Amino acid sequence: MIPWIAVQEAPLDAMALRSVMEDPHAGALVLFEGRARDHHEGRPVLELAYEAYVPMAEKELALLREKAIERYGLTRCAIHHRIGVVPLTEAAVIVATSSAHRAESFQAAAWVMDEIKQRVPIWKREKYRDGSESWVECTHRFQM
């Protein structure tokens, strides 16, 4: 069974995740993949590497999933994030949302991505073609 929430080193599988999103009540399915690209702010990127505090990341992702379902009236929601080295063109994160109508699924997927960047303890390091590395700005809001 494919989990609703995952933080893993293995490559992410969008088609497997899509299979758990099948729902006869949903008229819309949005499957967003955030992928490693070859540039950032004009610098050529070789690869990305993600680190996480996995137990808290999984907890925060589960809370985001619950809030997205409630806030947008989703029928289903899944969030998978990769950690470790992510080569160019491979998915670093997948957010899948389904709802009766498309607007809710699109809005929910965008909201989840924004919240991941703000709340979830997952950090991205970029390795550049010149051999240098840089942590990408990460600011998190933790709610107690």
Which sequence ranges carry the predicted segments?
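N-terminal, polar/charged subdomain of small-to-medium soluble alpha/beta proteins
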Residues: 1-92, 102-110, 114-144
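Short hydrophobic/aromatic beta-strand micro-patches
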Residues: 96-98
